[in-house]
């Protein structure tokens, strides 16, 4: 770095020169100014020299030291300062602090840049608002995005649909009617299949054929027969009578109108029982083809009456026979019918005798084909 030689020396005798004090002050100012221009002096270094200079007396007409210092400060402020601050390392920032003038210049540059940025931001906001207002005033312009509930499915345009295939094939195979001698080409398999399906759907199906399963009578399967209870006690014994009475009481409580009891041994057959209960009055009819079984049933009626009374049912009419009531009615009806036919037969014979028959008809019946000459 270039260093300027100090301008003030202690050996110079300034007393012999005219205006020595003024020249000393001027020389001191020039020395300070040269050091400030070289960038090597600081305010702390220049302050003692200025203080030394102020101790010297001034003559009339000489400039004051304070005026000289103010002129030096103004000259320092007039030094051009670059807008871009120099790059300062950490070591330089700690060793050489900035001067007051440089700090003020840097602050002015920073304020200027901040003002420019704020103006640019305001300008951008104003331009954006103006553009949005202009676009909103344009007809048919809508900034709001349209929200759709379901994503629209776009069919691929590369693959033709079945309808386009059919239409193109029909157009290629179609020919004008005026072309002579060109036989009609058969339809494609896809078109033929589609037409056949359409014909099947359009043709009404007969109602009778569809309704035939409903009209046919439902074949009911026979219900499984419940095995009739068996009276295993000896016929006519007290145990047999008790068992018979208990079964009949159970039938009345269950509301059954007909029941069967098998006897032991099996040769005795079964006892068919018909019940009818009305206002706690029971009517019973028991049928058995064996005479000694019917006698045992008649002997068990008192025990049966007592058993029903314990259940709150009074035995009213009882009937024990060798055939059922329906069989008796059928036999009676057949007997009456035979009697009616017997009564009508003699009447038919009398009618045949009394009917007048012509002689010609009688001759035809007897086979006599002669001619009556006396007629």
Curated annotation (Swiss-Prot):
State the source organism's domain of life: Bacteria
Q: Which Pfam families match?
A: Flg_hook
Q: Name the keywords, alphabetized.
A: Bacterial flagellum biogenesis
Its family?
A: Belongs to the FliK family.
Q: PANTHER family this protein is in? A: FLAGELLAR HOOK-LENGTH CONTROL PROTEIN (PTHR37533:SF2)
Please state what the annotation says regarding this protein's domains: Two-domain protein with the central portion of the sequence acting as a hinge or connector between the two.
Protein's UniProt name: Flagellar hook-length control protein
Write out the biased-composition intervals (Low complexity).
Answer: 328-339
GO BP annotations of the record are: bacterial-type flagellum assembly; bacterial-type flagellum-dependent cell motility
Region named Disordered: 319-363
Identify the GO cellular component terms for this protein: bacterial-type flagellum hook
The record's function comment reads: Controls the length of the flagellar hook.
Instruction: Identify the taxonomic lineage of the organism of origin.
Output: Bacteria, Pseudomonadati, Pseudomonadota, Gammaproteobacteria, Enterobacterales
Gene behind the chain = fliK
